[in-house]
Amino acid sequence: MSDMKIHFVVSPAEYAQGFGRQCIKQWGETNILKASYVVSIGGDGTALVAEQEALSAYLLTGQMLPVYVIDYSNTKEHVGALTNKGITTPQEIEGRIKEARKVPIYPLQADCILQQTNEQKSYFGINEITVKISRYEMTYMDVDILSKGKVKDSFYVAGDGIVIATPMGKTAYYHNLGGKSFQNDRLGLQTIAAKKNINKIIPDNHQVAIWVRSAHRPTCVMRDCNRTYQ
């Protein structure tokens, strides 16, 4: 048996869980901090969880683990845009990993400051970072786009929020909101149910500063559609 050290991330769906148990029986299960590879079994959502786990491990160890994503879903609604298809047995995993082409991913970093307490937290988004309402009340935001500390563009958002998408996320939530496609050296900004629909494509070395105006209207920060900060 190969000495590959694999950390598995498996969808909670029973269909994927069964295959996950077979894979762990074949390869064993390695703690992500000691693994050489991360293997995701499921769909796009499971892939994002695996990538977030790999990113968290990188922040602790300084080693970025490759994530190999196996498509394993039995639903017709499943998209699988991030997944590798055609794997039916655990024995195939080693060969497929060795044959795989590496695709670099550049996540977004969101630095959040709660103005009332000056509390600061940072989060990383693989597909997107979203700033949106956390209850059914419109939020108000001032948005600045900066390059090298200088403001290049500014606009105001009155609505449910805004999404900032990476090239990897341009076909996901951002796209469903009506955001236009863009090149791999760009980021996409798209408002959510705003009074004025705004879509902007900006260079990926620009920064986006978002100032939430209304403290009495709760607004949260989400990474890859998972709430992280409010």
Predicted region positions:
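Catalytic core of DAGKc-family lipid kinases
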Residues: Y72-G161
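ATP/NTP phosphate-donor binding region
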Residues: M1-I41, G45-Y58, G80-K102, L114-Y123
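A short helix->loop->beta-strand "cap" motif at the edges of active sites that frequently abuts
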Residues: A57-P66
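Short, solvent-exposed amphipathic alpha-helical segments in soluble enzyme
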Residues: Q22-Q26, A54-S56, L146, G178-F182, ...
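Active-site-proximal helix-loop elements at catalytic-domain edges
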Residues: V9-C23, W27, Q116-S147, I192-A193, ...
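Gly/Ser/Thr-rich active-site loops/lids in small-molecule metabolic enzymes
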Residues: F155-I198
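ATP/nucleoside-binding phosphotransfer catalytic cores, i.e., glycine-rich phosphate-binding loops
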Residues: Y123, V131, S147-D153, N197-Q230
